[in-house]
């Protein structure tokens, strides 16, 4: 009997402990969700300004009047950047909304959430279209540098700002466009709107915008319920990521798309852009295994990084880092230099090394491995970097295309 009582007490104790831990985890998860997922709050703020005539855009009517835009699954990783899967009529998209004043770069420090910060205050009433053009030109010149074809970009931006396609940009449309232009991702989407690997902009209202949905939202890996993720060791998780990948020819096609995107942003029409968070979750692909960008918020103009980092004091190189992957060096005067140490191509090759070498056909494995390691070794500050960059990138693409061009999987 004593033995039976002991077993019962032990059983009750562990049952109570399991219930307690489970309840605590659910409570923490719920609190985290309510803090991270504030889509209704974002919609209310945007629609309030739309109804007051402050802002306008192609998505405003569907969001605030007809209610044909629905917020689905919350994907937000930070409270100030709201991201949701959404539906707009018969289109599937991704809804992105800013919950703070994110008008400048930060170096790892979260900004305070906005409370009464006045957004949509520019341009002011009475601003002419010509004056607005000058404002836009000045802004993109500051962000991108003095490129010779900035006027073409200004025209693209004004075309995007004319949401109802009536040939005129109203003041509410201009206020929305100006707020969106403060965001790196929106500016890059306008610049790369005709490129294959950039998601299409479906519409916007204020600084809320909707992009094309990418079916597969990570370069590799498997999405697991959070309750399972908690109990999986990091080493096993990384191995699992490599298990759940497409066939090798399809992986090669995805990587070719990633290399093409690197080409798109490397010293293009409007300057050079830097990839400051090169992680698998920022790259996806569609049903045809064409690469599509998932998140471009940490892809920034090189000129912007130089402008901000040159004033930063430092003790070591680790103080001169923006995002996860854009770093410069700390000089003897304890100031950050303005030249990045690693080009985009080297970061991308490091990301796809294990992904691409796993399952590689034996006849090209040695050559592919050699090229990938040469790519990883690229430095940004070398004398002939641009020539080496082009040579390595083209050789990699040619090797992969040659191997997969006659396969059905590609």
Curated annotation (Swiss-Prot):
InterPro entries: FAM69_kinase_dom, FAM69_N. Keywords: Disulfide bond, Endoplasmic reticulum, Membrane, Signal-anchor, Transmembrane, Transmembrane helix. The chain crosses the membrane at residues 6-26. It comes from the Eukaryota. Pfam families: PIP49_C (PF12260), PIP49_N (PF14875). Among the many cysteines in the lumenal domain, most are probably involved in disulfide bonds. Signal peptide: none annotated. Residues 1-5 are cytoplasmic. It is found in: Endoplasmic reticulum membrane. GO terms for cellular component: endoplasmic reticulum membrane. Residues 27-410 are lumenal. It is a single-pass type II membrane protein. The keyword Transmembrane applies. Its main location: endoplasmic reticulum. Belongs to the DIPK family. This is Divergent protein kinase domain 1A. It comes from Xenopus laevis. The lineage of its organism: Eukaryota, Metazoa, Chordata, Craniata, Vertebrata.
């Amino acid at each position: 009997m004593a033995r039976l009582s002991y077993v019962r007490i032990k059983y009750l104790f562990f049952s109570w402990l399991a219930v307690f831990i489970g309840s605590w985890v659910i409570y923490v998860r719920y609190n985290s969700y309510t803090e991270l997922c504030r889509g209704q709050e974002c919609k209310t703020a945007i629609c309030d300004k739309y109804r007051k005539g402050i802002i306008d855009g192609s998505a405003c009517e569907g969001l605030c009047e007809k209610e044909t835009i629905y917020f689905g699954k919350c994907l937000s990783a930070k409270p100030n950047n709201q991201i949701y899967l959404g539906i707009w009529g018969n289109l599937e998209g991704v809804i992105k909304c800013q919950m703070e004043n994110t008008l400048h770069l930060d170096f790892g420090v979260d900004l305070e959430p906005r409370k009464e910060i006045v957004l949509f205050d520019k341009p002011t009433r009475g601003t002419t279209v010509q004056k607005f053009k000058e404002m836009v030109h000045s802004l993109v010149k500051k962000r991108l540098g003095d490129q010779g074809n900035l006027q073409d970009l200004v025209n693209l931006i004004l075309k995007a700002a004319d949401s109802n396609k009536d040939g005129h940009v109203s003041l509410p449309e201009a206020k929305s466009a100006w707020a969106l232009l403060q965001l790196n991702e929106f500016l890059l989407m306008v610049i790369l709107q005709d490129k294959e690997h950039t998601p299409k902009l479906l519409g916007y209202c204020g600084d809320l915008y909707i992009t094309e949905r990418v079916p597969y939202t990570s370069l590799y890996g498997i999405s697991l319920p959070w309750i399972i993720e908690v109990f999986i060791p990091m080493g096993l998780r990384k191995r699992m990521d490599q298990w759940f990948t497409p066939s090798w020819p399809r992986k090669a096609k995805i990587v070719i798309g990633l290399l093409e995107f690197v080409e798109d942003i490397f010293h293009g029409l409007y300057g050079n852009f830097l990839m400051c968070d090169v992680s698998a979750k920022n790259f996806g692909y569609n049903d045809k295994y064409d690469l599509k960008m998932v998140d471009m918020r940490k892809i920034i103009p090189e000129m912007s990084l130089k402008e901000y980092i040159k004033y930063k004091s430092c003790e070591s190189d680790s103080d001169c880092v923006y995002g996860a992957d854009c770093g410069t060096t700390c000089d003897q005067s304890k100031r950050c230099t303005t030249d990045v140490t690693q080009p985009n191509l080297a970061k991308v090759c490091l990301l796809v090394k294990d992904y691409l070498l796993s399952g590689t056909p034996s006849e090209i494995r040695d050559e592919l491995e050699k090229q990938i390691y040469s790519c990883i070794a690229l430095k940004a500050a070398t004398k002939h970097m641009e020539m080496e960059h082009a040579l390595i990138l083209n050789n990699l693409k040619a090797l992969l295309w040659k191997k997969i061009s006659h396969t059905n999987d590609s």
